[in-house]
Amino acid sequence: MSSMQFSSVLPLEGKACISPVRREGSASERLKVGDSSSIRHERASRRMCNGGRGPAATGAQCVLTSDASPADTLVLRTSFRRNYADPNEVAAVILGGGTGTQLFPLTSTRATPAVPIGGCYRLIDIPMSNCFNSGINKIFVMTQFNSASLNRHIHRTYLGGGINFTDGSVEVLAATQMPGEAAGWFRGTADAVRKFIWVLEDYYKNKSIEHILILSGDQLYRMDYMELVQKHVDDNADITLSCAPVGESRASEYGLVKFDSSGRVVQFSEKPKGDDLEAMKVDTSFLNFAIDDPAKYPYIASMGVYVFKRDVLLNLLKSRYAELHDFGSEILPRALHDHNVQAYVFTDYWEDIGTIRSFFDANMALCEQPPKFEFYDPKTPFFTSPRYLPPTKSDKCRIKEAIISHGCFLRECKIEHSIIGVRSRLNSGSELKNAMMMGADSYETEDEISRLMSEGKVPIGVGENTKISNCIIDMNARIGRDVVISNKEGVQEADRPEEGYYIRSGIVVIQKNATIKDGTVV
């Protein structure tokens, strides 16, 4: 095995992009700028150049060489940047959402970030895991409505789940009634941060925080936030918006942006309609390298992910726009006129879980082969509550394109293109197709099940010979025998709480703890 040597060269002048190079014989292959592997190589080389102490203080270039033959030589060249973004100088604020009306009835007893997704995760696990995988471990979660299950999940997963915070922390800040206020609830995204500005200010002074990362708790994506923060630092931006290309059909659901050739945002329009929407169209051909047929995505949408300079955020919320309550609709459109507001275009998978339809479609997409998004990645895993459940037990089942979580009991059933949550029970002859079953909080013993059935009651799970399609089944639902749930008549909207279900965008949603009696047809 050849030995490896490290050599530092003189500081470079100027500012350039990352350019790691692997030499193989006489050829050189340049890694794509922004590629995750190149970013990891860059960070590793900085640590080696700086004795493992984190970001280098100067522009020293690190060259990794070998005493092997020239054909085997590996040169890792990190181009100069004046300032490397340090995750220790970043604090993340995750917004817990409002009343959750768009995801009702899933939010009838829980906050939006606590809604289960992907079989065993919660929506809050997405930004939390992205933070940890990005090296950001100073996190505030702001909650208000129905926050009990969210607080419990955060405590079990991130405060007692074995995750190593080193010098970091996770703090839950709940909306409270303040003296002299007419209402204690957050009146918007900016107002949520403003209500706890005194907590954040005290924290910033003690922890040398320079950048504030604002995140949403109702989205599905995997992102290295430090790439976003690095662009923020490189551009000397006051505010940086993470943006994504979107198509015509959903463009009016988002805040849309336009930016110039330097990346500076010159126009921001919150959920435009009609002519205002048409005016926000842009030429997205510059995304040819990243997505197929960019002409299908003629709009650039704000993801609701922002980076602020600390002092800029404090000034905007306390002084400049002290009476404004929302970042997207009020503060950002005004701030871009006298602040350096930059755009960071994110081209990987991103889904805003804003409605029952988008939530259902995002979950069903996880079942596709190959899926557009996967929770599993050994280098950037998603964390969730450790439940210590046994593997799922199945007997004579037919399963196709499905995700089956831990601790389930499946007996002579058929599952197709569906997600089955933890502790689910499906009995003989039951069929699920295009369905999401969230599972149960606890098991019922065989004796308990026998007793319930002898009393004419329904145990937790799906009963014998029940057929379910295009449906979301919330936690602890009790669905009897010979039930058919398919919305055969194509009803788009319906409220049937007394019968245990709602219909939203044609999707039947069985309520949490609902009981659907034997023989019911929906």
Swiss-Prot record:
Stated regulation of activity: Insensitive to 3'phosphoglycerate and orthophosphate.
Pathway the protein acts in: Glycan biosynthesis; starch biosynthesis
UniProt keyword list: Allosteric enzyme, Amyloplast, ATP-binding, Chloroplast, Nucleotide-binding, Nucleotidyltransferase, Plastid, Starch biosynthesis, Transferase, Transit peptide
GO terms assigned for molecular function: ATP binding; glucose-1-phosphate adenylyltransferase activity
Tissue specificity: Abundantly expressed in the whole grains, a slightly less abundant expression is seen in leaves, while a low level expression is seen in the roots. A greater expression is seen in the endosperm than in the embryo and pericarp layers.
Region ranges (Disordered): 28-54
Reactions catalysed: alpha-D-glucose 1-phosphate + ATP + H(+) = ADP-alpha-D-glucose + diphosphate
PROSITE patterns recorded: ADP_GLC_PYROPHOSPH_1, ADP_GLC_PYROPHOSPH_2, ADP_GLC_PYROPHOSPH_3
UniProt subcellular location: Plastid, Chloroplast; Plastid, Amyloplast
GO cellular component term, pick one: chloroplast
Basic and acidic residues bias: start-end ranges: 28-42
Gene Ontology process terms (BP): glycogen biosynthetic process; starch biosynthetic process
EC number: 2.7.7.27
InterPro entries with a match to the protein in the record: ADP-Glc_PPase, ADP_Glu_pyroP_CS, NTP_transferase_dom, Nucleotide-diphossugar_trans, Trimer_LpxA-like_sf
Range annotated as the organelle transit peptide: 1-62
Keyword Nuclease attached: no
Entry similarity comment: Belongs to the bacterial/plant glucose-1-phosphate adenylyltransferase family.
Subunit: Heterotetramer.
Its job: This protein plays a role in synthesis of starch. It catalyzes the synthesis of the activated glycosyl donor, ADP-glucose from Glc-1-P and ATP.
PANTHER family: GLUCOSE-1-PHOSPHATE ADENYLYLTRANSFERASE LARGE SUBUNIT 1, CHLOROPLASTIC-RELATED, GLUCOSE-1-PHOSPHATE ADENYLYLTRANSFERASE-RELATED
Protein name: Glucose-1-phosphate adenylyltransferase large subunit, chloroplastic/amyloplastic
Gene behind the chain: AGP-L
